[in-house]
């Protein structure tokens, strides 16, 4: 009957709302997670004290951000300023009016797009709450509205919570600069106490590193029969301590169980995000202590030591001591450490990239402290473009293969890579962050690597540090006097998996950067939502998603898009 046909059409229509709601909820989960990380860093900054657990290690950056925010700095004690700035930063999470402070870093054209499309993020928590409200029963089911809020919620992460997490981590722990490290399971040491830090919050890992370097703890380790203490990292916590301290990187997300399987891990100490619940039961098969430290990530079969800024020192000391005392419980017959490891140069923050470029700038003729040398390389065609390679590795595909093969293909075509998170660790383990990897590059990029003394894949940090990439493209667009969407730059998450990756993808696209995925997002059940993400949003923000599971074709698509953008610019 006509009635039943009409109802059938209604039901078919509802699928688009269901898919759109799920996409928005996924985004909100990722945005909340990254932004809560940033909030914790702001709280830690509020506890900073010259005689306390946490100190201000980059006062110049704190002063620079304060001036950017219109805060008076003259004559202020640096710790008073830190406390004032932390309170202002925390207000960004719940302020009743206005939009995020860091949005002003974007080019004017981008800011105008955000205002016109009504996606400029307001208070961070408001965007998450609004997303959950919109997806409650009886609220939004219009795909356009749901996708628009997904972009807004993502922007509150990338230009809000993540950016604060990045900037104030630099203030507390030091702004990264190029430093040598090693990557892969071969960084574990058979004759030392091995402590693995895993998760995302540098507040924990920095303190563990402090006490692992303590002469008293090292002496105690030798007393217990070890030659010393070796700290290595997994996941984004690893990126944090690698780029500031040169701490070796044992592996990324899908390597976390393998560090326990070496039989040489005295303790795996975790904070939040991307932690396998299976680590508890697995650790019981060995002598490993599985230590959780956050009320946000409590798990079975773990030893829980509540970690906070006020008690950080005593907590970290207790954990390091526990690991040392566990060394004697190793079972030699279960110890197997693979010999594989690679050299890597990491720590290319935005500030470090500027300083690296200054080394190849003729200061007698050209202004230093800018991205002009990079723009000139791109405009001249010596470098064809850049790809931000980010995101997870994924058990649905052969882990890390897409990251590594795409990077090799891109650098061979003179495309420089900036990488973060698990993608960065994949590159490091494959030797692509070794300066000798220049030999895999096309002639133009190889020459740039030689002149600037850099690897072809630049380690820019953890997943929250994709905010550094946003600042980089914003400043490059300003230097080139073009819009971000016109730059021969694309983003790629070939093995994305987590909710955070969806939030990242949304803020990268909303910033005007075409983004390429190698794993399908959970929207294929709706032609309308799929159409919006792969095409429709381009009318809003001048960028969109491309999904291609064939990795070779994905690489070709990125190269073609870069050349298309170059042709449009006439360079």
How would you describe each model-predicted region?
Residues 2-7, 11:
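Single conserved hydrophobic/aromatic residue that forms the stacking wall/gate
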Residues 8-9, 145-178, 182, 191-249, ...:
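Conserved mixed alpha/beta catalytic, RNA-binding, or beta-rich assembly cores of soluble enzyme
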Residues 10, 45-46, 55, 63:
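Active-site loops and adjacent core secondary-structure elements that bind or stabilize anionic groups
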Residues 14, 18-21, 264-333:
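Mobile "lid/hinge" segments at catalytic clefts and subdomain interfaces of large enzymes
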Residues 93, 97-192, 203-205:
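Low-complexity, highly charged intrinsically disordered N-terminal segments
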Residues 171-185, 212-221, 251-258, 276, ...:
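Structured alpha-helical segments in the cores of large, soluble enzyme domains
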Residues 247-260, 288-292, 408, 429-464, ...:
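Acidic, Ser/Thr-rich peripheral helices and adjacent loops at domain boundaries
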Residues 489-571:
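Extended hydrophobic packing segments that form well-structured cores
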């Amino acid at each position: 009957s006509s009635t039943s046909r009409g109802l059938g059409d209604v039901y078919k229509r509802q699928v688009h709302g269901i898919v759109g709601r799920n996409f928005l909820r996924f985004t909100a989960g990722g945005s909340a997670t990254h932004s809560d990380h940033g909030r914790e860093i702001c709280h830690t900054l509020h506890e900073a004290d010259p005689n306390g657990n946490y100190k201000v290690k980059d006062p110049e950056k704190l002063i620079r951000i304060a001036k950017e925010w219109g805060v008076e700095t003259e004559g202020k004690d640096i710790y008073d300023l830190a406390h004032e700035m932390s309170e202002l930063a925390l207000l960004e999470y719940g302020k009743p009016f206005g939009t995020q402070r860091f949005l002003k870093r974007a080019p004017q054209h981008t800011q105008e797009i955000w205002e016109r499309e009504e996606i400029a993020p307001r208070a961070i928590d408001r965007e998450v709450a609004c997303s959950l409200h919109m997806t409650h029963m009886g609220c939004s089911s219009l795909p356009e509205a749901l996708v628009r809020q997904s972009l807004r919620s993502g922007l509150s992460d990338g230009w809000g919570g993540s950016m604060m997490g990045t900037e104030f981590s630099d203030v507390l722990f030091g702004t990264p600069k190029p430093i040598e490290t090693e990557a892969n399971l071969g960084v574990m040491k058979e004759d030392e106490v091995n402590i693995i830090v895993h998760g995302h919050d540098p507040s924990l890992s920095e303190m563990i590193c402090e006490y692992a370097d303590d002469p008293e703890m090292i002496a105690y380790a030798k007393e217990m029969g070890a030659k010393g203490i070796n700290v290595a990292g997994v996941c984004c916590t690893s990126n944090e301590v690698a780029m500031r301290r040169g701490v070796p990187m044992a592996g990324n997300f899908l390597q976390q169980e393998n560090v326990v399987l070496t039989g040489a891990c005295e303790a795996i100490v975790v904070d939040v995000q991307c932690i396998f619940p299976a680590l508890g039961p697995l650790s019981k098969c060995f002598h490993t202590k599985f230590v959780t430290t956050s009320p946000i990530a409590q798990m079975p079969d773990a030893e829980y030591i509540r970690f906070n800024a006020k008690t950080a020192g005593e907590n970290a000391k207790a954990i390091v001591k526990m690991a040392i005392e566990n060394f004697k419980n190793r079972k030699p017959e279960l110890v197997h450490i693979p010999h594989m490891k690679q050299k890597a140069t990491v720590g290319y923050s935005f500030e470090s990239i500027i300083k690296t470029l200054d080394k190849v700038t003729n200061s007698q003729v050209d202004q230093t402290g800018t991205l002009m040398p990079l723009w000139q390389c791109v405009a001249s065609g010596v470098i064809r473009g850049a790809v931000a390679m980010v995101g997870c590795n994924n058990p649905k595909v052969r882990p890390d293969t897409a990251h590594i093969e795409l990077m090799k293909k891109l650098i061979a075509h003179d495309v420089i890579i900036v990488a973060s998170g698990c993608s960065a660790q994949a590159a490091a383990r494959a030797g692509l962050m070794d300066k000798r990897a220049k030999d895999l590059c096309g002639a133009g990029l190889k020459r740039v690597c030689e002149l600037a003394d850099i690897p072809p894949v630049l380690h820019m940090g953890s997943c929250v540090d994709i905010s550094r990439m946003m600042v980089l493209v914003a400043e490059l667009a300003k230097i080139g006097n073009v819009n971000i969407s016109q730059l021969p730059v694309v983003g790629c998450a070939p093995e994305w998996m987590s909710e955070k990756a969806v939030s990242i993808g949304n803020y990268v696209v909303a910033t005007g950067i075409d983004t390429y995925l190698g794993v399908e997002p959970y929207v294929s059940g709706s032609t309308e939502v799929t159409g919006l993400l792969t095409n429709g949003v381009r009318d809003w923000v001048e960028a969109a998603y491309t999904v291609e599971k064939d990795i070779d074709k994905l690489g070709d698509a990125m190269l073609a898009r870069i050349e298309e953008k170059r042709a449009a610019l006439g360079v």
